[in-house]
């Protein structure tokens, strides 16, 4: 009998070798056995349609199961699904949950949404707080980190211009 860790490793190996249907089956076994990473990957397979037809409802189900086990990436993926549906407030709420679990990319997205007034009232101070969270996060992609730095520089420059003209 193979261990749960073996199932996950075999699933990733199958995925890496282009055996999507085999990977899907293994991720499903791992997810049903309670492996959070397998839940997230299975959700992604259903979300994008890898090894199966895309099924956003099944993706949402698996992402929510992973989130209930504390997975920040799952909360972020749920937010993206809600964004795709045009459900802006729900997307904002789920990015907030993901950011609360330490996801710096979600903090950056919350800053951008706050500046644009999408999903919540426009707020530069709130955007600045989210940018600070993103910049202090250990869980942020390099691209998002660079974008957060650039956005913070832009906000700082805008504040300086406003204080000189005011």
Please place each PLM-identified region on the residue numbering.
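Hydrophobic face of amphipathic alpha-helices that form TPR/SEL1-like repeat modules
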Residues: 8-13, 41-48, 75-84, 109-116, ...
